[in-house]
Amino acid sequence: MWNKTAFPMGNVNKKADCLRMVCLCCFDESFFSFQGHCDKINKTRLFGENERILQAAKKGTVTDMELQIQVAQAAKKIMEIQNNVSKVIVGKEAVFRKLMAAFLAGGNVLLEDMPGTGKTKLARALAASIDAEFGRIQFTPDLLPSDVTGLNIYRQDQGVFEFTAGPVFCNILLADEINRATPRTQSGLLECMEERQVTVDGVSRRMKAPFFLIATQNPVETAGTYPLPEAQIDRFAMQLSMGYPTMEEELAIIDRYKSDDPLAQLEPVCTCEDILQLQELCRRIYVSDSVKKYLVQIIQATREHDGLAMGVNPRGTLSYLHCVQAYAMIQGREYVTPDDVKELCVPVLGHRIISYRAGQSGSTKEILQEILEQIPAPTEEWTR
């Protein structure tokens, strides 16, 4: 049970970490596997010391202990969602964890990848796993903003205008090939993405909660496309790529899909209400002053770098903070570490900066890696 792949632990340096490990193992001992020096811990010895660890933890506040337990339960629930999605999507666990971090942070995701790599199935599998309403829009040059948001239709028999909701009124929306629509149509999503509402003819209507936009675009085929404006691309919490499967993963795909589509048999493991609670919980994840300073130093460096025409704005700073909080919670921690900040640097910031070498592939990623190498990560305690 202890050899199952799980989320990385990081350094275990305080009694709070021990309590967190015990909580996770008590909920489901197959849920967590210790890594690094934790592999040396004998399972029997650890559980034999449960009482001592819990007594030591009583020196902290009840609120801290409750948060640790809630985070352990949340991480277990997210693992259940991931395991459910993995029945449809083979591999890509790291991508899914980042996508879930953006979702729980209240953001949206831009998937830039080749056709046929499983982007649509990923969105559908996530929606099915949380019992959410799924919507899909195929963006084309002739698509109108009203086709996205909805419009008022005059009912002649009643003599009134009646609002017909567009496909954005759902929980998880797949905006397929978003860069094929005109900028006017693309702009119809701005209010949805940022304010979670739609305004038609001066009347604003709240969207369903939770709402998560997964937009896709083809990185190679550019004929007949309209590049996303900075104002819109900045509203995506992360830009991710699933990539092609490995040989082992592709063989598993063949075996899994040789008969029925596993997506049709997928059952929900939680509800949208559970997701809303997880979104609230991730905002309570602790971020120490040293980690906050480290995060802001990275942001400031993007504005001062000679190779960048535009750095990250304050909206990006807040998105970065919320994403690392969610990412820490997904890994079962009630606090953020510098490794979380490093891990999400490129997915969260890569699409928000403009490089003078924009025509060169991977230039922004290289600049961000350079910034990470130049700024020393904090080494002091990150827990409360």
Each model region followed by its residue ranges:
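Walker A/P-loop
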Residues: F103-T140
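Conserved alpha-helical scaffold flanking the Walker A/P-loop in AAA+ ATPase domains
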Residues: K98-A101, Y154-L174
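C-terminal engagement/docking regions of AAA+ P-loop ATPases
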Residues: E304-R384
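Pre-Walker A (pre-P-loop) alpha-helix and adjacent loop at the N terminus of AAA/AAA+ ATPase modules
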Residues: A72-V109, M114
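Canonical AAA+ ATPase core
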Residues: R155-V160, A181, T185, M193-C270, ...
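Walker B catalytic acidic pair
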Residues: D176-E177, G188
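Short, positively charged and aromatic/hydrophobic N-terminal segments
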Residues: G10, R20, S33, K40, ...
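N-terminal amphipathic/hydrophobic targeting modules at extreme N-termini
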Residues: F7-N11, K15-C26, F31, G36
